[in-house]
């Protein structure tokens, strides 16, 4: 994975724990350490044994010498494939060069310790790491493609798919996208496996919340792709219509200051709360008091899109009604009018109308 332990990536944490429950030894090789003030307790324990590496060190240099001596052709071929595949995208190229030294070191460590298989989360730099490890060693790799990683930059995607033992994606929408990009041969390597939910933690609540005020919950990184600004505008429309509404925005991120200004400008300081990050247990507690969970996702100007927000699955597991954008793989989870309500992205009026319907 790119970073660990990341609060928002509960789907990665849940998968690690579930695989370990099956008796499989899991070793973690994150590309970067995530520095956060709130961490899931289970992730904190895993981080204690994760293999974090600096970008450059003497052991890393020794690993490069090891592969250069053993098979200069494989080493040069792996580096050339990375440079050729990422050329033309400044961000991807710089990121790929940045991780190359430590990935070579990780490859040597995995080989020395008898790692049988490498699985990577996200089809961008983590999958590139798996691709490199596969080129340097005989260890097979696979990866999971989620959402934004397939939309912003697909460089090397088809090379990664071709080299992988298999590829998991979290929606039929993503599967179709990969087949369109890489052609029919990719179809045989693809499996759709939706992200899971801890139903021991997220389970039907014992009692409904009080009828008033109408309580709206939104969980996710405060980022343009999550569309929280459109929910704030929908809350303004509901308040103008005389509806006693309270909205709780869970998460943190680059849009926090802008959202706080929007809330203040709309006069919603007593109706919309930005409460910051919460653990999985904290989100479960908030769901117990919510009338609805909203996922107002939007495509960004750069083309970034969500896959299927895990917060939607968690809410539905708790029996909480959901309203979400009709986007990407979300309609595979939310059957409009049956298991939830779907609205067009970037449409606060439609969002407010759906919330009034509830």
Please annotate each region the language model reported.
Residues 312, 317, 321-324, 334:
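Short hydrophobic beta-strand element within catalytic cores of glycosyltransferases
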């Amino acid at each position: 994975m790119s970073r660990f332990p990341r609060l928002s990536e509960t789907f990665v944490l849940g998968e690690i724990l579930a695989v370990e429950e099956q008796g499989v030894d899991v070793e973690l090789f994150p590309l970067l350490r995530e520095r956060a003030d709130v961490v899931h307790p289970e992730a904190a324990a895993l981080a204690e044994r994760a293999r974090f590496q600096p970008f450059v060190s003497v052991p890393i240099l020794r690993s490069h010498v090891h592969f250069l001596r053993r098979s200069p052709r494989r080493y040069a071929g792996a580096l050339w494939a990375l440079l050729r595949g990422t050329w033309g995208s400044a961000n991807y190229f710089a990121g790929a060069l940045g991780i190359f030294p430590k990935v070579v070191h990780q490859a040597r460590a995995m080989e020395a310790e008898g790692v049988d298989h490498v699985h990577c989360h996200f089809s961008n730099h983590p999958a590139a790491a798996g691709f490199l490890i596969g080129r340097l060693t005989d260890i097979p790799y696979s990866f999971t493609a989620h959402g934004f990683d397939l939309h912003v930059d697909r460089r090397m995607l088809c090379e990664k798919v071709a080299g992988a033992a298999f590829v998991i994606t979290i929606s039929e929408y993503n599967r179709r996208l990969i087949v369109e990009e890489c052609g029919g041969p990719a179809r045989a390597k693809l499996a759709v496996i939706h992200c899971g939910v801890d139903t021991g933690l997220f389970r039907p609540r014992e009692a409904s919340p009080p009828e008033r005020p109408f309580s709206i919950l939104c969980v996710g990184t405060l980022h343009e792709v999550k569309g929280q600004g459109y929910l704030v505008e929908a809350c303004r429309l509901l308040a103008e219509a005389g509806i006693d509404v309270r909205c709780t925005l869970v998460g943190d991120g680059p849009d926090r200051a802008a959202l706080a200004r929007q809330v203040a400008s709309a006069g919603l300081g007593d109706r919309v709360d930005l409460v910051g990050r919460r653990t999985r247990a904290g989100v479960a507690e908030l769901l117990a008091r919510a009338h609805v969970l909203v996922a107002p996702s939007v495509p960004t100007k750069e083309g970034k899109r969500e896959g299927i927000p895990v917060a939607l699955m968690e809410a539905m597991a708790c029996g909480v009604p959901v309203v979400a954008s009709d986007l990407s793989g979300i309609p595979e989870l939310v059957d409009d009018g049956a298991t939830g309500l779907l609205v067009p992205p970037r449409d606060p009026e439609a969002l407010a109308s759906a919330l009034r319907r509830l």
